[in-house]
Regions:
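Short Lys/Arg-rich cationic patches that frequently serve as NLS/NoLS or arginine-rich RNA/DNA-binding motifs
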Residues: 1-7
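Conserved acidic
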Residues: 7, 13, 22-87, 91-574
Length: 574
């Protein structure tokens, strides 16, 4: 069936004011005011607070639900999907969920049952999306106050006394209503800022292709890097987007077992705790900027490709190679420190901290105790997204998790064990060889490759362009004086519109600093997030007004073939 293209249109901003009853864990919030800012027909590029607002107040769920029906009718008439923006959407939407689910099917693109990106109302007869709610929290996670500061519209403070007990019938003062209205004005002002800060961004992308800071990075790449063409050996041209998509699809795991093995051999980083000084104040501590290290990791090394299952005997050669390489050689050949890359399951006997090493002296262990758990929980030992935890537990149920016999754990780390069976890649095994020692090893199974290539241009260019833009913007931010034409050279990384306003001195210092700090640095730091995800995780469903994980969409051995993505822009080897 041909996919129906839908046009999404920002039409309103939604918020509530609530009152609390009860104390402590028994505290409950209930809504006493529903706030709606109708911004249909407004050009967000020219939005002006006050002039372009149509703020209405409703005191009951039914009153506001009637308002939603008006938006739905408007969308059907103009053949668009109305988008209603909010901040921390599910808190404000909870009073409406049960009633909305009676009349519509509900589909959510969510991080958790209380943290959604979008929530769609779907007509049961036509199976058509008729309304979308969009949580703008994921554009600026520091709060509406920070969002307002970025776009130059401070959030109102101090005008609403939350200690008072109110009901939907309690009269509200003009001052209280002014306070309540400000939050539904901050969001369109922030969207205006985004449109001016990203010249490639159009209004029809908002609430559709642009939902989060990470999606801003994706769309920046799609509109500025994806169209670039490279020559193929045949003489034909290939866009960087197509080249990257082909690479990602080629590197997807071929079987469920291969997927599980790679999940078990996760290519993540490590944290460290020094047991010997855990209860002491330590001076002269050095710290590394891990965000910048992401870009060293993205740009500064070759990536392995074309993994294939091999016999343990071949993996034994890989093992011996890894264990023979010293730290100096790794640092001198950071771009490609090893001849082979692999994912293997290995059994180690009598593992302990390496005698005479700094790790033994200071009690620094490497391997996380979470890797040895048969089940993980979101927020505790496996991120915040419950879907990732569910998919991880499916892999663990299939037997792909680390195991131990008579182990000693402390500070969330493995210090010793009579025996461990572990899933490791070449980087992790090399690191383990620096920290631990063991008496015997046995390789059970795995996959390897000796094929390495420079990292894909599609991602590398994102990093390089934003890094250069960040440095150029930093210099301007330190030297620009509002109201005066900028006297120095403006590099080509600065968007034309912003460059023109700098040259004639009309750019406000507040806008430029916000663009530098929030947009440029934010997108630069968000590149890694576009690749750090599992394309096989399940989705959400709504039942009786409650969001929950749809277990029918989990990826298992039985449905592996049907769960393959039609297209993919996530490169696992990052």
């Amino acid at each position: 069936m041909k996919k129906v293209k839908r046009n999404y249109r920002i039409c309103a901003v939604y918020d509530t004011e609530t009152c609390n009853i009860g104390k402590g864990n028994l505290t409950r919030a209930y809504p006493i005011l529903f706030i709606d800012n109708d911004i249909r027909g407004i050009d967000l590029l020219e939005y002006e607070t006050g002039r372009d607002d149509k703020v209405r107040f409703y005191r009951s769920e039914d009153e506001y639900l009637s308002r939603l029906e008006e938006y739905i009718e408007w969308g059907l008439f103009f053949k668009v999907v109305p988008v209603i923006c909010a901040y921390n959407l599910m808190f404000d939407l909870q009073p409406l969920m049960e009633k909305m689910s009676r009349d519509y099917d509900i589909s959510a693109n969510a991080q958790s049952s209380t943290n959604v990106y979008t929530l769609d109302l779907i007509d049961r007869e036509t199976d058509r999306t008729v309304l979308r709610f969009w949580d703008t929290f994921h554009l600026e996670m520091r709060g509406l106050k920070a969002m307002g500061e970025t776009c130059g519209l401070p959030k109102a403070t101090g005008d609403w006394d939350y200690s008072l007990v109110r009901t939907p019938q309690t009269p509200l003062t003009d001052t209280e209503l002014y306070y309540a209205a400000r939050d539904v004005q901050v969001i369109p002002a922030y969207l205006k800022y985004l449109l001016h800060a990203n010249e490639w961004l159009t209004q029809d992308m908002l609430g559709n292709r642009v939902l989060t800071k990470t999606s801003l990075v994706r769309q920046m790449a799609k509109h500025t890097i994806a169209p670039l063409r490279v020559d193929k050996k045949s003489g034909k041209k290939l866009t960087l987007e197509k080249a990257f998509t082909k690479l990602c699809e080629a590197e997807l795991p071929k079987t469920f077992q291969q997927y599980c093995l790679r999940k078990g051999c996760f290519r993540g980083g490590f944290t460290f705790t020094a047991a010997a000084t855990a209860n002491e104040v330590v001076h002269n501590v050095a710290s590394l900027d891990v965000t910048s290290m992401h870009h060293t990791f993205i740009n500064g090394r070759y990536v392995p490709l074309g993994f294939k299952p091999v016999l343990p005997g071949l993996l034994e050669i890989d093992y011996n190679e890894i264990m023979a390489i010293n730290r100096k050689n790794v640092l001198n050949n950071y771009h490609k420190p090893f001849k082979h890359a692999f994912h293997m399951v290995i059994r180690l006997k009598n593992i302990r901290l390496r005698k005479g090493s700094c790790f033994d002296k200071w009690g620094i262990a490497l391997e996380s105790s979470a890797k040895f758990k048969k089940e993980v929980a979101p927020g505790l030992d496996f991120g915040e997204d419950p879907r990732n935890a569910v998919q991880e537990n499916i892999v663990k149920e299939f037997g792909f998790y680390d195991k131990y016999v008579d182990a000693e754990f402390a500070f969330g780390k493995l210090y010793s064990a009579r025996e461990v069976t572990m899933h490791v890649n070449e980087i992790e095994l090399w690191c383990m060889g620096r920290v631990y020692e063991w008496d015997e090893h046995e390789i059970l199974f795995g996959e390897d490759t000796c094929s390495w290539k420079v990292p894909p241009d599609y991602v590398t260019l994102q990093s390089n362009i934003l890094y250069e833009m960040k440095n150029d913007a930093k210099y301007i931010n330190n030297h620009y004086k509002q109201g005066e034409p900028y006297p120095y050279e403006i590099k080509g990384t600065i968007p034309d519109g912003i460059a023109a306003s700098l040259k004639n001195g009309t750019c406000t210092a507040q806008f430029f600093e916000a663009w530098y700090v929030s947009t440029v640095k934010g997108q630069f730091n968000g590149i890694y997030g576009t690749q750090a995800q599992d394309v096989y995780k399940p989705s959400y469903k709504c039942e009786q007004g409650e969001l929950m994980i749809d277990h029918d969409t989990e990826t298992t051995q039985e449905n592996w073939e049907e769960k393959q993505p039609k297209t993919c822009k996530v490169f696992y080897n990052y």
